[in-house]
Amino acid sequence: MMRSHYCGQLNESLEGQEITLCGWVHRRRDHGGVIFLDIRDREGMAQVVFDPDRADSFAAADRVRSEYVVKVVGKVRARPAGAVNANMASGAIEVLGYELEVLNESETPPFPLNEYSDVGEETRLRYRFIDLRRPEMAEKLRLRSRITTSIRRYLDDNGFLDVETPILTRATPEGARDYLVPSRTHPGSFFALPQSPQLFKQLLMVAGFDRYYQIAKCFRDEDLRADRQPEFTQIDIETSFLNEEDIIGLTEKMVRQLFKEVLDLEFGDFPHMTFEEAMRRYGSDKPDLRNPLELVDVADQLTGVEFKVFSGPANDPKGRVAALRVPGAASMARSQIDDYTKFVSIYGAKGLAYIKVNERAKGPEGLQSPIVKFIPEDNLNVILDRVGAVDGDIVFFGADKFKIVSEALGALRIKIGNDLKLHTCEWAPMWVVDFPMFEENDDGSFTALHHPFTAPKCTPEELEANPATALSRAYDMVLNGTELGGGSIRIHRKEMQQAVFRLLGIAEDEQQEKFGFLLDALKYGAPPHGGLAFGLDRLVMLMTGAQSIREVIAFPKTQSAADVMTQAPGVVDAKALRELHIRLREQPKAE
């Protein structure tokens, strides 16, 4: 091997030993006739000293520049008193260089590797092979590897089998658009890249592989945001003969062990909260419990007021009027309130009413708000008591359809919590359970809240009689307001699966066309089964403190689903298109 040690492995225990390093020149300094090279590899940095007594190596060190690839032979020694660098893992020692071999030269990089804050993301992605040399980026990928190793070890130890499922499969309605791959051998037909291994892992349960896992690549052709990529990685898990409590316990233990091994963090038992409670208290099915702010329903106090903005939703069975108290924020400027009003409009809110509590003892005169005059004093006091308002607080109100109020005030809760730095802890894991089976659309039709293979907590007859109120056997793990993983007990009886399909408007012939293989499998002794899938990219993003999953993926796509480094997607030549029996209606425009 060309090296004996990684740079980041050097420490005082190696003092006096001769070692060989290979890496990149991170920095070169010439101090009074002595040349210092900071050599960098994936594990860290080491300082190598060259003095004029060794003419050949000194001359070589004098010629090297940043990002040259070098091989260094030298002896580890303690740094002189006063020269210890506490910012480096190997800062107590240095290497006295005996030999220096330049393995390759480098042009000046397109951006400095130690000062990247002013470099645009597109430039960083265009030169990703340079960007990944930065210690911050290398550390994220090292931690990602440790995370997957820990997860694999836990699942292996608990009897799970790592089984690969197909990448080329058929399109199924799973919510997002599929990436389609034309078939050369079947003209006019297309494969689809999997949005998840969902159906294949269920078929593995039917086949008797009762504990399955896979670190799976998944693909979704959807609009991107900070936590989305067109291709992403999933920790996919499925089991037979376990109920939801068993699966929750098994995977929660996995995550607790993971955080202990990788970050040395101890988590207690994760609290459980129903979907209904999460929406009412936090306006979200993935609440961030680090934030102490909560939504409080106040519609019962506003049904009789003349202010239609409140009384309308208060008397609407599908409406909601809720309050959000922000302690100590009564001094908030009007311009800030206007900014928050504009913010909630993104979620469909038509306005943002508020009450500033200056002196409650003075009654309505001690309150500052344009809406106080519309609310009887007794009702006003009940509302302020219910939300726990005291002098110095501000209370915001939302009034509209339940979904709009919940989403708008829920998002405002998160924004204010971040703006005012209200978080009470660093980590807040939890489970959300008892999700509705379906979401009702404006036209009265239904959409599966999770996916159409989730089992309900009722019989097929009860489900078809009351689909709008049916609950599912689904569960989501949430960490700091981010959904880490979602899962459910699956439907394992054909009659139930067909009932769900019917409620989703999938006709029998379409059921056979798209899911015939699954319905066939359910006829042949499918066991009770369920599972869960974690988003690996999101998990690594949270554990590294990254702002985007693009920071924890080696070669991510941009917000427009493009790879600026390889220039993908690209134009395909006419011959390849003919072989695929494809003709373009419009020629692609040159960029």
UniProtKB/Swiss-Prot annotation:
The organism of origin for this protein: Pseudomonas syringae pv. syringae (strain B728a)
GO biological process: aspartyl-tRNA aminoacylation
Region (Aspartate): 198-201
Keyword Transcription regulation found: no
Catalytic activity: tRNA(Asx) + L-aspartate + ATP = L-aspartyl-tRNA(Asx) + AMP + diphosphate
EC numbers for this chain: 6.1.1.23
InterPro entries: Aa-tRNA-synt_II, aa-tRNA-synth_II, aa-tRNA-synth_II/BPL/LPL, Asp-tRNA-ligase_1, Asp-tRNA-ligase_1_N, Asp/Asn-tRNA-synth_IIb, AspRS_core, GAD-like_sf
Annotated positions binding L-aspartate: E174, R220, H450, R490
Top-level taxon: Bacteria
UniProt protein name: Aspartate--tRNA(Asp/Asn) ligase
GO cellular component labels: cytoplasm
Pfam families linked to this entry: GAD (PF02938), tRNA-synt_2 (PF00152), tRNA_anti-codon (PF01336)
PANTHER family: ASPARTATE--TRNA LIGASE, MITOCHONDRIAL, ASPARTYL/LYSYL-TRNA SYNTHETASE
Family: Belongs to the class-II aminoacyl-tRNA synthetase family. Type 1 subfamily.
Location, primary (coarse class): cytoplasm
GO terms assigned for molecular function: aspartate-tRNA ligase activity; aspartate-tRNA(Asn) ligase activity; ATP binding; nucleic acid binding
